[in-house]
Design a protein with these regions (language model features):
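A short, structured active-site edge motif that brings together acidic residues
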Residues: 22-33, 55-60, 119-122
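Active-site groove signature of glycoside hydrolases
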Residues: 45-68
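Short acidic capping loops at alpha-helix termini that bridge into adjacent secondary structure
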Residues: 20-23, 51-55, 90-91
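N-terminal binding-site loop/beta-alpha segment at the start of enzyme catalytic domains
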Residues: 1-23, 79, 85
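Glycine-rich anion/phosphate-binding loops
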Residues: 32-40
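Acidic (Asp/Glu)-rich catalytic clusters
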Residues: 12-21, 42-51, 106-111, 139, ...
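Beta/alpha (TIM)-barrel catalytic core signal, keyed to glycine-rich beta->alpha loops juxtaposed to Asp/Glu
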Residues: 7, 61-247
Length: 247
């Protein structure tokens, strides 16, 4: 959950408090400064009605100057570290669907980083350019014993331009166009899970959640031949990530 997700924190709060011991709670902030990060952390704790957040993450890192800012003396990570010392957060991470090279730099520069959230799916795995090389992020994180959370596993491409399909008419709430057929969802989950990620993150639209959970429950591995076959089939498809390529 994140403050930028509308009133999601307020809606989640009541059920979260009922089942707090059963839930690993991840939250994010787009603030890059010390003061801003503290302010948003306090807000999220209050809105969620909890005393601690299991994983608190820098949300949507995209540019080099942002990395410089969060790692500075007055940056967000200084606030994260204080909050961790005070028991308000248990772990600290960052998320990005931007340049893999930036995530690699973050892994090298932030010694106490505990998780990274980044895209991984057969479309980006099939691209030859470094700007799609999220597999390098997975490898570096594994070397450093940093947790890996895979997002955009179910991304099927970008939506048509808004003059062709207005946002209000999109059949799913995701900012990217998701795959929606049960067999496609199962195939995408199997691929992501087979990469050795710590966790595969669900898609954002509630209409897809049940199918993804069913795919997870039925997961029985995916061999190398099946992975390569899927990559070859979709490698020329459009990818909505890295995000900066679409600005």
């Amino acid at each position: 959950v994140a403050p930028t997700y509308g009133d999601a924190e307020l809606k989640l709060g009541p059920k979260l408090r009922q089942h707090r011991e059963e839930i690993f709670l991840g939250c994010k902030t787009q603030e890059r400064t010390y003061e801003g990060a503290w302010r948003k952390l306090d807000q999220s704790l209050n809105r969620l009605g909890v005393d601690t957040i299991d994983l608190y993450q820098v949300h949507g890192l995209e540019y080099d100057e942002e990395l410089d800012e969060i790692t500075g003396d007055d940056g967000a990570l200084a606030a994260f570290r204080e909050a961790k010392e005070q028991g308000l957060i248990d772990h600290m991470g960052l998320t990005s669907h931007g340049d893999p090279g930036l995530i690699l730099d973050a892994l090298d520069r932030i010694d106490d980083l505990e998780s990274v959230m980044f895209p991984l799916n057969p479309v980006v795995a099939g691209k030859d350019d470094d700007e799609y090389d999220y597999e390098a992020v997975l490898a570096r994180a594994d070397e450093k014993n940093v947790g890996t959370l895979g997002i955009k596993a179910f991304a099927g491409g970008s939506w048509p331009p808004t003059d062709e399909l207005p946002e209000a008419d999109r059949p799913f709430a995701n900012w990217y166009r998701p795959v929606t057929a049960p067999d496609e969802i199962r195939e995408r989950f199997d691929f992501a899970a087979a990469q050795g990620l710590t966790s595969v993150i669900n898609a954002g639209d509630p209409k897809l959640v049940t199918m993804i959970l069913e795919a997870a429950a039925d997961y029985d591995g995916m061999d190398e031949v099946a992975q390569r076959s899927l990559i070859e089939r979709v490698r020329h498809d459009d990818s909505p990530v890295p995000e900066q390529l679409h600005h």
